[in-house]
Amino acid sequence: MQILLVSTIKRRVGIDATASRSRIIYEIASGLVKNGHEVSLIGTADSSVDNVRTIPIIDKGFAELSGFENRFYAETSYLVKLCKKVEEIGSDFDVIHNHTYPELINLFASERIKTPMITTLHAQATSEYDEALSLFPNANLVSISNAHRSMFKKAKIQNVVYNGIDTQAFSFESKKDDYLLWIGRLGATKDENNNFVDAKGAKWAIKLAQATGERLVISGNVEDEEFYEKEVKPNLNDKIQWIGPISREQRLQREEIIKLMQKAKAFLMTINWEEPFGLVMVEAMSCGTPVIGFDRGAVSELVVEGKTGYVVPPSDGVEGLRKALGKISDIDPNDCRKHAENNFSVEKMVENYEKLYRKLIEKM
């Protein structure tokens, strides 16, 4: 098949991409090429996937650029250029797979070309976004978990395809060191009630470490330096450590993250929001590391209670996390690995998307 992947202008796509959306696009593109398809990618000029043709809209990720007179208009203008490019060249392909941020921008183009388009929704299902998507009842929308799908009350979501990871890269390690691991985006964001919250839950991980005396390793990208300075840095000591750059766009290299995941005795998913998937949980389990997470978003869907980790009611707070941690030695790392291999591999993800591509093409 001739397949067009429509990426985001916000960040580049590559093996070293830090954002989950960009990493998934990279894995899909690589997997499709491996299966013999011809793949093109619309996105940033510095995106790089072996044997994939890049069609540039912007030199590099918009998140890295500055100096615009009006940042909103600048980003919107690039999105319009991207949408027009999809409309111009879309008919040259058998199928289009849309991942743009925001995803709905290319739904306008899909109504004006004959080539079928699949749109994978990566974003949180806010009420405004849900309503906007519902204006395209014929769009082929895919969510990334059943929990994610259930968040949309108006939009018609036809299919669910789990994200996949390179299980060979996130390889198995049975021997663990004595530390807990938290990796995520640091920063306060507004919730549905317009209150600022620590969405990824770094503060919960710190509270657990303080309550138990456990060693905690924290890493990720710092989107809000003030949050890091106020909420994280004052708590750092010989037991609670930050590893990696203090940067919005940079974090540890993938190989370094894998090593941390392989040796951690537990990965903490202490989120304060309804996360649609949670790629880091799957990566940790692939390394044989169990997950302890709050029952929000897709956590209970991805983690098998008592077998690959523990799911804690958010209302139980630190005490619930502590109880789960006390049972962590009951988890067999081999079960974590098997669960990741059987359900969340790149091969499985690509196979599921190929089935959807063929199904759409047959309908034409």
Feature names for model-found ranges:
Residues M1-M364:
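Catalytic cores of nucleotide-sugar-dependent glycosyltransferases that transfer UDP/GDP/TDP-activated
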